[in-house]
Amino acid sequence: MNGEARSRVVDQEAGSTPSTLRDEDHPSRQRLFGCLPYDIDLNPLRIVMAELVGTFILMFSVCGVISSTQLSGGHVGLLEYAVTAGLSVVVVVYSIGHISGAHLNPSITIAFAVFGGFPWSQVPLYITAQTLGATAATLVGVSVYGVNADIMATKPALSCVSAFFVELIATSIVVFLASALHCGPHQNLGNLTGFVIGTVISLGVLITGPISGGSMNPARSLGPAVVAWDFEDLWIYMTAPVIGAIIGVLTYRSISLKTRPCPSPVSPSVSSLLR
């Protein structure tokens, strides 16, 4: 069997359409610039960009609903905030879920690295992309709507202790469901996955909004804090979601008797997307 035939067999076994592209012709291995003497693998780059763009969409949507309400002279309604966060997650999951997994949240990335089989080597890349996306979205939101960045920030409405524990508990609920979708018998929900994730995000915002501002995401809180240069009580939103996410994964693995990490989904290559 020649090389072309073997390539067709491998493609058919993988469920993709047959392709006669050589390795050096695959878009994921092309040279970005002709002056470079080596090929660059585009897969890590596009995964990082997917997380950055996805987090940008999520954060800009949040900035939009907060700013629009502020400009209209009203107060941000909890239901509007929850629906906006949930719908934006639905959009992003369907847009980039097949590329990066659509974590959009450093706490989810860390929790899946600890217990879910996600490679630690990619954790810094994901967190950097998520933080940059949230910060860029806040900057754009401030410029577009002409508001102060501090209205995007998350602050405890009651005590720091209450905010800490409500963020921890809500994040554990969100990640508990995410673990079930990733590892459980319902991992093949197909087109319903995005709506399920978006629904639980909305639930989390409804639970946490009156107490902590509804973050459950270190990047979502860090972006506005950096732009406003106000880091008061930021430690709550940096630590509680991470601890809660780890508890969520650990709880699911304990009650489902999972003894091994769930396999991390393999992101498709650029070449397979373009065939």
UniProtKB/Swiss-Prot annotation:
As for membrane topology, the entry says: Multi-pass membrane protein
Query: Cross-referenced Pfam families, in alphabetical order?
Result: MIP (PF00230)
What are the protein's GO molecular function terms?
A: active borate transmembrane transporter activity; channel activity
Tell me the Gene3D superfamilies matching this sequence.
Answer: Glycerol uptake facilitator protein
Keywords, comma-separated and alphabetical = Membrane, Phosphoprotein, Repeat, Transmembrane, Transmembrane helix, Transport
Q: Which InterPro entries match?
A: Aquaporin-like, Aquaporin_transptr, MIP, MIP_CS
Tell me where on the tree of life, at the top rank, the source sits. Eukaryota
Q: Basic and acidic residues: which segments have biased composition?
A: 1-11
Question: Which positions does the motif NPA 2 occupy?
Answer: 217-219
| A single GO BP | borate transmembrane transport
Entry's localization field: Membrane
Give the residue ranges of motif NPA 1. Answer: 105-107
Q: List modified residues, type Phosphoserine.
A: S272
Positions the record marks as coiled coil are none
Q: Where is this region: Disordered?
A: 1-26
Q: Which residues cross the membrane?
A: 47-67, 76-96, 127-147, 161-181, 192-212, 231-251
Record-level GO cellular component terms: membrane
In terms of one coarse class, where is the protein primarily found?
membrane
| Purpose of the protein | Aquaporins facilitate the transport of water and small neutral solutes across cell membranes.
As for family, the record states:
Belongs to the MIP/aquaporin (TC 1.A.8) family. NIP (TC 1.A.8.12) subfamily.
Q: What is this protein called?
A: Probable aquaporin NIP7-1
